[in-house]
């Protein structure tokens, strides 16, 4: 049997690369240039799995990832992966920095170091931290640096100037491990944590959904709300929760205009 394939936001050295290695160490790695490309490869079954960052412990929800998940019922969450996000500065010199390149999430995770060391530098967003490092390594003026990972510097032999510039030494990024195909009820119990996605045309329906959760002691661990783009001021809700049971899926779904059970997986976070 051939080895499974797992897609991640590349190039190699990104935190997504690290997540893929942790999630599926025996799978073949497939580096892709964007989150959209990662999900397209998964839904078209070019790969068997994918990792997608959804939350950072310092900077919150990864909004572009959630927007790509809106309305999808062709993929399933089967795991979560926690990746320590220790950021480094890569480049030629810190003496005359005019631009800092990185993925947008990284800027928010390193704001204290930036303010203290290069407060006047221009932020330039690129598709990944590894792409930022590759671009900064080609700069011959000494005016451009990148926020990236130590793995990226080591794998590509880039010049590493400063380590561990993140605001919080416990900084972590949480990834979902996804596979193709919607949720299949195989009669086995759900795992500890579940991911739900639903659209509500009126806010009063949210109260009804939460009443079901409260009555059955379902604990909401994460709630992300995104515009539905159907009608103004209506929303799509992404809910992660502990204690969801199969008989509650229909109970919750009857209050929703659309409802997708996006999978269940082992919880990796200690909440209590």
Curated annotation (Swiss-Prot):
Its EC number is 4.2.1.51. Residues 194-272 form the ACT domain. One of its GO terms (cellular component) is cytoplasm. GO terms for biological process: L-phenylalanine biosynthetic process. InterPro entries: ACT-like_dom_sf, ACT_dom, Preph_deHydtase. Belongs to the PHA2 family. This is Putative prephenate dehydratase. It comes from Schizosaccharomyces pombe (strain 972 / ATCC 24843) (Fission yeast).
């Amino acid at each position: 049997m051939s080895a499974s394939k797992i897609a991640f936001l590349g190039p190699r050295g990104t935190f997504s690369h690290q997540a893929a290695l942790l999630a599926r160490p025996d799978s073949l790695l497939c580096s892709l240039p964007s989150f959209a490309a990662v999900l397209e490869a998964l839904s078209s079954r070019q790969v068997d799995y994918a990792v997608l960052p959804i939350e950072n412990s310092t900077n919150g929800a990864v909004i572009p990832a959630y927007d790509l998940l809106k309305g999808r019922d062709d993929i399933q969450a089967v795991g979560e992966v926690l990746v320590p996000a220790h950021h480094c500065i890569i480049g030629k010199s810190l003496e005359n920095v005019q631009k800092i390149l990185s993925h947008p999430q990284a800027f928010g995770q390193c704001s204290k170091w930036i303010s203290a060391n290069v407060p006047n530098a221009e932020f330039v967003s690129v598709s990944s931290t590894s792409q930022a490092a590759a671009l900064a390594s080609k700069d011959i003026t000494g005016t451009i640096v990148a926020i990236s990972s130590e793995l990226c510097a080591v794998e590509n032999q880039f010049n590493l100037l400063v380590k561990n510039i993140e605001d919080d030494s416990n900084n972590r990024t949480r990834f979902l491990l996804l596979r193709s195909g919607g949720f299949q009820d195989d009669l086995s119990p759900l795992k500890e944590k579940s991911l739900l996605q639903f659209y509500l045309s009126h806010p009063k329906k949210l109260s009804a959904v939460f009443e079901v959760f409260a009555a059955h002691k379902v604990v909401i661990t994460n709630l992300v709300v995104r515009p539905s783009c159907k009608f103004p001021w209506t929303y799509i809700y992404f809910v992660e929760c502990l204690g969801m049971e199969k008989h509650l899926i229909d109970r919750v779904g009857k209050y929703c205009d659309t409802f997708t059970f996006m999978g269940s997986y082992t919880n990796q976070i200690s909440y209590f």
